[in-house]
């Protein structure tokens, strides 16, 4: 495949899906673990780094920064799209995941309220959120697409920052090697 960003994006997307499928098959609660969710960024970063290095070798490292950041950003976007599509599909096929997430969110919010927030207005908002979650837990749950698309869009901002960081890291490493 000629496009480096697309190649590493698809490869990384497959790796992330495999990683989360493995977690899901071992134990569902592992799939929902925030630490293991964040650990998947290592796959993102590895693919972004390889794409940036390969793109730099092919097109040169002295190009405009905006041109260099494209490959790792495309990698991030494709991996992230693959992840969120997998996440959405898995939640549609296994509604128990959404119940588990709701229970975790409810527990977290109750712990926050018990610990005390200090601000009465924030405490009232948290109580309202807890009531909404308790009502939601009673009804049959279906994963809506809207929040998934919102998370995908917000994640793209962070993805661009990661791509810029990887690009800067690769460029500075190349500059050090040339000295």
Predicted segments, located by residue:
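Transmembrane alpha-helical insertion/packing segments
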Residues: 1-59
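Short, charged juxtamembrane terminal tails flanking transmembrane helices
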Residues: 1-4, 170-179
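Amphipathic, cytosolic membrane-interfacial segments at TM-TM junctions
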Residues: 56-69
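C-terminal halves and exits of single transmembrane alpha-helices
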Residues: 74-97
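Membrane-interface interhelical loops and short interface/amphipathic helices
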Residues: 94-141
């Amino acid at each position: 495949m000629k496009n480096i960003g697309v190649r590493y994006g698809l490869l990384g997307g497959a790796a992330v899906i495999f990683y989360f499928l493995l977690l899901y098959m071992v134990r569902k609660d592992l799939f929902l673990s925030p630490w293991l969710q964040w650990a998947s960024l290592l796959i993102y970063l590895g693919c972004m780094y390889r794409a940036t290095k390969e793109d730099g070798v092919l097109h040169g490292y002295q190009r405009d920064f905006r041109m260099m950041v494209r490959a790792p950003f495309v990698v991030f976007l494709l991996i992230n799209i693959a992840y969120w599509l997998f996440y959405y599909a898995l939640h549609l096929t296994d509604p128990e995941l959404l119940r588990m997430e709701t229970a975790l969110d409810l527990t977290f919010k109750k712990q926050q309220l018990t610990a005390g927030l200090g601000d009465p207005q924030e405490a009232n908002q948290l109580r309202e959120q807890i009531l909404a979650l308790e009502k939601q837990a009673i009804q049959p749950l279906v994963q809506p697409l809207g929040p998934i698309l919102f998370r995908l869009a917000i994640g793209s901002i962070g993805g661009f920052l990661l791509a810029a960081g990887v690009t800067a890291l690769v460029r500075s490493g190349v500059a050090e090697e040339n000295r």
